[in-house]
Amino acid sequence: MKKNQSAAIGKVSLDDKYALAATRAYMTGIEALVRLPMLQHQRDQSRGLNTAAYISGYRGSPIGGLDQALWKARPWLDKHNVVFQPGINEDLAATAVWGSQQTNLFEGARYDGVFGMWYGKGPGVDRSMDVIKHANAFGTSRYG
């Protein structure tokens, strides 16, 4: 590598994928899914909102390694009010995510809203349609 090429690249760390705020970071697709709720939290903060995230899904999902990547990124997720709790199955995970988005139903909520992320496999999506249908009909809190 030429001298000027290394200067252009700069110092690179494996933590960049979660630690960098305003520059390019290289990551896998799974790592991008892990970073997504952190970015949403940053966007909400810039709008003056105090939000959190709740992530759940079925560990047997074909999104291999997402649960492990979320656990590994916990120090960064904690800084952005992101909670990961795997579900026993897709139905329970989807129900938990929807429930986390109902902050407007209770007085004294700690957050302006909780946005959610759910994942599952094909047959689990079919089974979870009841929850998804009710969540779409009932909705979420304003910032959920």
Q: Where are the regions that the model predicts?
A:
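Thiamine diphosphate
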Residues: 1-144
